[in-house]
From Swiss-Prot:
Lineage, opening ranks: Viruses, Riboviria, Pararnavirae, Artverviricota, Revtraviricetes
Modified residues (Phosphoserine): S84
Protein's name in the database: Protein Vpr
Keyword terms: Activator, AIDS, Cell cycle, Host G2/M cell cycle arrest by virus, Host nucleus, Host-virus interaction, Modulation of host cell cycle by virus, Phosphoprotein, Transcription, Transcription regulation, Viral penetration into host nucleus, Virion, Virus entry into host cell
Cellular component GO terms held in the UniProt record: host cell; host cell nucleus; virion component
Entry coiled-coil feature ranges: none
Subunit field text: Interacts with human UNG.
Organism of derivation: Human immunodeficiency virus type 2 subtype A (isolate KR)
Amino acid sequence: MTEAPAEFPPEDETPPRGPGDEWVIGILRELREEALKHFDPRLLTTLGNYICARHGDTLESARELINVLQRALFVHFRAGCKISRIGQTRGETPFSAIPTPRGMQ
C-alpha cells in the first residue's frame, strides 16, 4: 500500500495580505498626527480615553476613534481652517454667529 500524498492548499502568485490590525493602527497614527496640528492635545486625549472606556482597548475602539477624527477634521476643514488648503476661502466659520462665553475672550 502506498501512502497518500500530503495535501497543500493551492499556491497563488499574489503577495500575502498584511493583517488588518496593522492597517487600522497605521491609519490611526496618521490621523492622530494630523489632528494634533488642528486640535488641542487635551481634547484628543479626553476623546481617546472616552472611546477606550466605552469600547475597551480593542480594534473596535481604534475604528471608532478613526471615524470620529475623520468627521472632526472634515468639519474643521469645511469651517475654513487657516492652515489647510481644503475648506472655504471666506475666512469666517459657521460658529462665528455664536457669542463667546463671558470670561473666554
